[in-house]
Amino acid sequence: DLANELSRNGRRSGLTFAPEGGSERMRKVINKMVTEEDLIRTVATAYGNGWRQVKLYFMCGLPTETDEDVLQIAELARRVIETGRQVSGTRDIRCTVSIGGFVPKPHTPFQWAAQLDHETTDARLHKLRDAIRADRQYGKSIGFRYHDGKPGTVEGLLSRGDRRVGAVIEQVWRDGSRFDGWS
């Protein structure tokens, strides 16, 4: 059993899972064949074996994504906490939702997909944050981390641009920028 093997040394700090799409519909779009029930069964095993924290990684701005797809992340995190409390017998369960913006990359199935503007990405993430905070029963057990959308726009330009982007990078450097906001 993988959960037992991972915790054999007694350390159970946390496990990370990457459903990536907020809804099953989105996971099908990106060909990530993990159902909600698969994930719930997996976190139940983790919590049942003594783990107290899981992290769920998602992307926002995927092709065909809607606000509702993103808001499904709050419901999934709620189910994770509920399941963890049931199988562990304790309320001391945490789930951190971490979200990065989708950046189309060359030589991938979505290389020609449009990148969502950062204003829309940020608006969706603020709605999600508010939905998590509004959950009186589970919200305090759900952490929420996301990256501002602007650096993702730059990443999209750098990853899909051609040699002409070099002149832009040089000019930005001459103007005094040094990877500001990148870590």
Residue positions per predicted region:
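Long, polar/charge-rich, low-hydrophobicity segments
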Residues: 78, 84-88, 111-122, 127
